[in-house]
């Protein structure tokens, strides 16, 4: 078993008083929030901000919560079990969407409710439910 850790931003904006989240469709077809692996000497938050900008062209305006949401799951890759941890920071973002075509096929702004129906994996739905609880406080 190998362990993997990714960091991402849950990119939010307000549109006419309603929170929306930006989801990306990866080249392999699944929908999720942007995330990636750290580079040398990078903190988790630095990784998350860099990956957000690289994949979407968006930048963090402010963190909505200082407490990240952690998602854990396992999958098999080339016959090896991967124990994956994803740490997400909830943030309000700004900028013009510019997708990194090498990794990202598509991107959409959706209400949190609609996004829960679009994300591919159950873990992603759980993460968005936690986001809803944080922003509804």
Regions found by a protein language model. Name each.
Residues 1-21:
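Conserved N-terminal beta-strand and adjoining loop/helix that marks the start
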Residues 11-13, 25, 92-93:
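Residue-level signal for short segments within beta-strands and strand-turn junctions
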Residues 17-59:
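Conserved Nudix-box catalytic region and its N-terminal flanking loop in Nudix hydrolases
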Residues 32, 83, 109:
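Short aromatic/basic micro-patch
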Residues 57-96:
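Active-site segment of metal-dependent pyrophosphate-handling enzymes
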Residues 90-92, 97-130:
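NUDIX/MutT-family hydrolases
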Residues 130-137:
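C-terminal alpha-helix
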């Amino acid at each position: 078993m190998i362990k993997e850790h990714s960091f991402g931003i849950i990119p939010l904006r307000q549109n006419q008083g309603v929170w929306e989240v930006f989801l990306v469709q990866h080249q392999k077809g699944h929908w999720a929030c942007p995330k990636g692996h750290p580079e040398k000497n990078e903190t988790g938050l630095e990784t998350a901000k860099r990956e957000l900008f690289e994949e979407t062209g968006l930048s963090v305006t402010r963190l909505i919560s200082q407490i990240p949401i952690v998602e854990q799951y396992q999958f098999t890759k080339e016959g090896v079990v991967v124990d994956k941890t994803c740490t997400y920071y909830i943030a309000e973002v700004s900028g013009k969407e510019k997708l990194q075509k090498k990794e990202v096929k598509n991107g959409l702004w959706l209400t949190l409710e609609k996004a829960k129906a679009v994300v591919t994996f159950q873990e992603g739905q759980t993460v968005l439910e936690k986001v809803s609880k944080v922003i509804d406080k």
